[in-house]
Amino acid sequence: MSDSIISFAAFILADAGLEITSDNLLTITKAAGANVDNVWADVYAKALEGKDLKEILSGFHNAGPVAGAGAASGAAAAGGDAAAEEEKEEEAAEESDDDMGFGLFD
């Protein structure tokens, strides 16, 4: 549970535009009445050192829908031939999985 509390503290610091340091993380957790080991604060501070937490989170939000929408619009623009080629590629990929011998229920 300590890691969750430290994560939320890091989000609070990032939102406030403050530097994510071990001391700042511990200050927020103590103000919230949570007892957190110093180790967790040190680990998170070192992991997030020099990184923009807001940029990391916005990158996850933007990456998913853009990739899916681009592939869907490309297939629609190319017409039925692209869809048929995609199906052939998927079938080939499924067949190659069978050849590996890793089937659990074969």
Curated annotation (Swiss-Prot):
One of its GO terms (biological process) is cytoplasmic translation. Residues 83-100 have a biased composition (Acidic residues). Residues 69-82 have a biased composition (Low complexity). The modification N-acetylserine is found at residue 2. Keywords: Acetylation, Cytoplasm, Phosphoprotein, Ribonucleoprotein, Ribosomal protein. Component of the ribosome, a large ribonucleoprotein complex responsible for the synthesis of proteins in the cell. The small ribosomal subunit (SSU) binds messenger RNAs (mRNAs) and translates the encoded message by selecting cognate aminoacyl-transfer RNA (tRNA) molecules. The large subunit (LSU) contains the ribosomal catalytic site termed the peptidyl transferase center (PTC), which catalyzes the formation of peptide bonds, thereby polymerizing the amino acids delivered by tRNAs into a polypeptide chain. The 4 small acidic ribosomal P-proteins from yeast can be classified into two couples of similar but not identical sequences. Each couple (P1A/P1B and P2A/P2B) is distinctly related to one of the two acidic ribosomal P-proteins P1/P2 present in multicellular organisms. Belongs to the eukaryotic ribosomal protein P1/P2 family. Component of the large ribosomal subunit (LSU). Mature yeast ribosomes consist of a small (40S) and a large (60S) subunit. The 40S small subunit contains 1 molecule of ribosomal RNA (18S rRNA) and 33 different proteins (encoded by 57 genes). The large 60S subunit contains 3 rRNA molecules (25S, 5.8S and 5S rRNA) and 46 different proteins (encoded by 81 genes). The 5 acidic ribosomal P-proteins form the stalk structure of the 60S subunit. They are organized as a pentameric complex in which uL10/P0 interacts with 2 heterodimers, P1A-P2B and P1B-P2A. This is Large ribosomal subunit protein P1B. It comes from Saccharomyces cerevisiae (strain ATCC 204508 / S288c). The lineage of its organism: Eukaryota, Fungi, Dikarya, Ascomycota, Saccharomycotina. The gene is RPP1B.
